[in-house]
Amino acid sequence: IRQNHQDEPQYGQQVAPIDQRVQRLVMALVFAAKSDGHIERKMRSIIEQNMREAGISEQGERLVQQAIDQPLDPQLLARDIQNEEEALELYFLSCAVIDVDHFMERTYLAALGHALKIPQDVRDGIEQDIREKKQSITD
C-alpha cells in the first residue's frame, strides 16, 4: 500500500487531532523548559525533534509555539487534570526537564506541585528519583 502512495508525502503521518493529554504534556514540557525565564534554542530543537519523531510535527510545532506564547501558569496546566496519574505525570515530566539551578525553576516547580495538589513528600520523592537517574546517566 505504501508504494502506491509514494507521491503523497503526507501519507502515513498522523493526521488525527492531537488529544488533550498530548496538548497538556507539550505545554508542561515547554513551561518547564522556560521556567527560568526563557527557552533555550537547543531545548526548543529537542522538543520539535520529539514532535517529528512522534509523527505530529506540524501540529506539534503549533502546540509548542502556543505554549511559548502563553504566560507561565501552573494553574492552567492543572485545570483539567482528571486524576492522580495525570497530575504525577505532569510533575514528573516537568522535573525531568528542569535542572534546578535557578530560583525561578524552583519557584515554578513549587507552584506546579501546589496547583496539582501533590503533597510535598511526594514531590520530594519524585525530585530525588529524577536527580538520582540524572546522576547515574552522567556517571
Curated annotation (Swiss-Prot):
Organism superkingdom: Bacteria
Family the entry assigns: To E.coli YebE.
Designated name of the protein: Uncharacterized protein in ampR 5'region
